[in-house]
């Protein structure tokens, strides 16, 4: 009996020893198991490589532009008579466009973000429709809406204005192409502000305008700046609607197009660089400000 009991105990201890913490797990049929750290490092390397490829592909046009531009051709193009007039036209029309968006787009974004308008989905659908319309289609629709042979066009003529091949037409085209970007971005920025903060300020006696000025706009400021910067870049590059309703006066996009058609690619590249220099600093500055504001909130 004692020998049988000892044999059973030895067998039991052997079974427990195979599955206990002191024993290694059996090897997988395909070989030794991979360490989770190795798997994570391999997947991380693949992710970084894929991200780098995508990043280089996105920046490829800009890098190619800088590599192919000739200093001599740039000097000749930018110093030719009237070469800087498109830059002035683009900056002036872009500034007016931003002013219109700030004055008209910000209240609309606030009303939509706070649900103060009836049928908010209809308003948002309208903004998305304008956002998704091809720019050339926007230009055609503007001709039928504010052209010289429309009721709006006749009303503008009575005021000695015109929405065809004028500075006003250029601003209208830029507003229509950039407004959805600003209003939708401003909606998201204002919607991220906690309404309870506005309610607390109102309970303390602040009027709605003061609440908007002292609470809502400062908290939504980075997001509003980012939306405005995107609208600026969109207005600076507006071409499809502009070429139909405002072929004159020339802005930078039309200058690039006409130079490309008349004298070739080498002469158009310097104006493309000027357009990038004018259009990109504001979005980059807004991005840096927004990132810093987010870090301050988290910290």
Predicted regions and their residues:
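Membrane-water interface segments at the C-terminal ends of transmembrane alpha-helices
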Residues: 38-72, 81-191, 215, 219-235, ...
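A short glycine-centered flexible hinge/capping loop motif at secondary-structure junctions
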Residues: 101, 204-206
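Short coil/turn motifs that cap or connect alpha-helices
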Residues: 118, 207-208
């Amino acid at each position: 009996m004692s020998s049988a009991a000892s044999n059973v105990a030895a067998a039991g201890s052997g079974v427990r020893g195979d599955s206990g913490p002191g024993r290694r797990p059996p090897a997988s049929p395909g070989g030794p198991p991979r360490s989770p750290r190795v798997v994570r490092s391999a997947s991380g390397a693949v992710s970084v490589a894929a991200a780098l490829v995508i990043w280089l592909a996105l920046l490829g046009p800009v890098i190619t532009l800088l590599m192919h531009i000739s200093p001599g051709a740039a000097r000749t193009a930018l110093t030719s008579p009237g070469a800087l007039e498109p830059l002035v036209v683009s900056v002036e029309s872009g500034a007016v466009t931003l002013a219109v968006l700030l004055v008209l787009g910000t209240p609309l974004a606030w009303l939509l973000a706070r649900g103060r308008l009836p049928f908010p989905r209809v308003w948002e659908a309208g903004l998305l429709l304008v956002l998704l319309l091809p720019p050339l289609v926007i230009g055609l629709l503007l001709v039928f809406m504010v052209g010289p042979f429309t009721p709006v066009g006749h009303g503008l003529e009575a005021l000695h204005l015109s929405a065809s091949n004028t500075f006003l037409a250029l601003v209208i085209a830029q507003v229509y192409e950039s407004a959805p970007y600003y209003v939708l971005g401003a909606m998201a920025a204002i919607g991220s502000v906690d309404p309870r903060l506005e309610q607390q300020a109102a309970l303390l006696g602040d009027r709605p305008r003061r609440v908007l000025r002292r609470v809502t706009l400062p908290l939504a400021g980075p997001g509003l700046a980012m939306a405005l910067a995107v609208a600026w870049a969109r207005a600076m590059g507006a071409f499809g609607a502009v070429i139909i309703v405002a072929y004159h006066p020339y802005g930078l996009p039309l200058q690039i197009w006409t130079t490309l058609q008349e004298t070739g690619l080498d002469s158009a590249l310097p104006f493309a660089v000027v357009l990038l220099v004018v259009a990109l600093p504001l979005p980059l500055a807004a991005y840096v400000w927004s990132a810093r504001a987010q870090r301050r909130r988290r910290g």
